[in-house]
């Protein structure tokens, strides 16, 4: 073989390798790299709002806010630019206001371990609840039937309630009665935001597919706002550095090569975060702030949904 032919052959081989390597760096933007999903179901959960003596750590007040089977709608969109990488945006929102419950406990006597004051508000409305989650998954292990990897993302969750009417028992039962029916007593909002890390996995056998996700954060920031309407007082708290644990289990069946019906369960737990509190008198405009661990915020919730996923 002539020298020129050998050189030409080598150049052709190297050129082909370079083109192959270059093509691997180009993200896949074809329709089949995109997946969308929608589902509907129910949200339930419970939040706690606490107030402490910042110097002694003694609990002074606790409000328990419940969420009872509120209807939600979920949406999810994923893009696989490479076989080893998935970009995802997902979220859910309440479809309408829903049912809740609130119990308010106070410990006004520091020498008494049991609460002294309690009010109950069965006619509590969940005004709204929603969440969004932006994340990326890197698939470290892959085969025809499974893949496993790591994930990182940012998540924000909000809840809002209004308690109306109800009954009360104050000073160890010395004063009892009822609040006027339908009258607003307390309104409460919570917001949690955080970056997170986690593990992700997927397994498929024939037309059945199982997905699992575990999320963890040590960097939760929480905010709340409490409106005591009958006292014209506003309480605001901020906390940071608390923990979050979450899991998502998704099981589905492919009714066509591109369409999957699925059911999904999610569980989220925001551990109590402690921080300072601010009290605002809405009549006078006066404000008092207390630092340290004067307040606490926590939540745990779960969703159960069913829906349809489609890959283009």
Curated annotation (Swiss-Prot):
Transmembrane region(s): 32-40, 71-80, 85-94, 132-140, 146-154, 195-204, 208-216, 245-255, 259-267, 302-312
Activity regulation (record text): Requires bacterial lipopolysaccharide (LPS) for activation; addition of LPS to inactive protein reactivates it. In the absence of LPS the active site groove is slightly narrower, and peptide substrate binds deep within the active site groove, displacing the nucleophilic water molecule.
UniProt keyword Lipoprotein present: no
Residue ranges that the UniProt entry lists as topological domain Periplasmic: 21-31, 81-84, 141-145, 205-207, 256-258
pH-activity relationship: Optimum pH is 6-7 for plasminogen cleavage.
Superkingdom, natural source: Bacteria
Any single GO CC term annotated in Swiss-Prot or TrEMBL for this entry: cell outer membrane
UniProt signal peptide: 1-20
The protein's enzyme class: hydrolase
Outcome after substituting residue 104 to E: A high percentage of mice survive Y.pestis infection
Pfam family, one: Omptin
Reactions catalysed: Converts human Glu-plasminogen to plasmin by cleaving the 560-Arg-|-Val-561 peptide bond that is also hydrolyzed by the mammalian u-plasminogen activator and t-plasminogen activator. Also cleaves arginyl bonds in other proteins
A GO molecular function held by the record: aspartic-type endopeptidase activity
Family the entry assigns: Belongs to the peptidase A26 family.
Name of this chain's protein: Plasminogen activator
Protein species of origin: Yersinia pestis
Lineage, opening ranks: Bacteria, Pseudomonadati, Pseudomonadota, Gammaproteobacteria, Enterobacterales
Primary gene name: pla
